[in-house]
């Protein structure tokens, strides 16, 4: 059943885009809006409590609709949906390991994209915190399966998938160095997935530039750890440990890192883990 309505007044209702691949067959716990055309206003598509089916998803894809829109006020319900889905995927014995890894990494990629799209919003950061707790549990519950998320990593260091990979790697490394410390493991996974938050505003052509950077370009790159840390500092739910990790992940014990050129013990354990 499709519920039509007048276009959503975006001045009153803040919406965020969600890939339709995020949805599987289930009873909706949130309202869904869609845009009939890229520049068209959003209209109500399904209301809370109505079933969304795989056939519905397929029909939308056939109409070349890639995104649905959810009210920001219902972000917590979307967090639950995505969290439940990745949990089910990780433990699904019917999925090949490669497919499990692909689905989980794709979900985490979307979570990080939400953080980048909506700066200074607590809801997307809370979703990363939820996922970090799952990663921390998986790292000890089934380290072999969890490590496969890292095995799927590529080599593009300026993508959200790279940030997912760093979060996975931090979880694995801390599990080896500090086994049993779940709080630390969770914090470092979160820091790993957020470590390059400050690169949001840097043009892709600069991030991917080959060869030596001009002095002004280098200064732009050097500032990204401080920019990311400053943004997270505005969110009281983010642990200080995570903020420190984001700020210092390019520092090196010999003083050759940036942005401050910290040396020796001034480079925190968290920053060293992220650097690896």
Where are these regions (language model features)?
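Non-catalytic interface/linker regions that flank or bridge core catalytic/transmembrane domains
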Residues: 1-160
């Amino acid at each position: 059943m499709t519920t039509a309505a007048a276009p959503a007044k975006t001045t009153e209702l803040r919406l965020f885009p969600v890939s339709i691949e995020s949805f599987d067959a289930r009873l909706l716990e949130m309202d869904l809006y869609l845009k009939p055309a890229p520049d068209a206003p959003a209209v109500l598509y399904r209301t809370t409590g109505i079933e969304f089916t795989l056939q519905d998803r397929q029909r939308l894809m056939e109409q070349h609709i890639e995104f649905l829109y959810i009210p920001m006020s219902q972000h917590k319900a979307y967090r639950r949906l995505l969290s439940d889905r990745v949990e089910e995927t990780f433990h699904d014995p019917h999925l090949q390991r490669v497919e499990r890894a692909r689905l989980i990494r794709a979900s985490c990629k979307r979570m990080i994209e939400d953080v980048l799209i909506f700066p200074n919003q607590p809801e997307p950061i809370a979703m990363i915190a939820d996922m970090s707790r799952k990663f921390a549990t998986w790292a000890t519950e089934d380290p072999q399966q969890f490590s496969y998320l890292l095995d799927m990593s590529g080599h593009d260091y300026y993508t959200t998938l790279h940030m997912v990979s760093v979060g996975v790697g931090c979880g694995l490394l801390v599990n080896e160095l500090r086994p049993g410390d779940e709080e630390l493991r969770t914090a470092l996974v979160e820091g790993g997935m957020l470590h390059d938050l400050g690169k949001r505003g840097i043009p892709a052509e600069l991030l991917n530039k080959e060869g030596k950077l001009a002095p002004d370009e280098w200064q732009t790159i050097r500032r990204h750890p401080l920019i990311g840390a400053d943004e997270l500092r505005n969110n009281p739910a983010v642990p200080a440990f995570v903020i420190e990790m984001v700020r210092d992940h390019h520092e090196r014990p010999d003083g050759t890192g940036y942005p401050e050129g910290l040396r020796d013990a001034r480079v925190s354990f968290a920053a060293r883990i992220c650097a690896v």
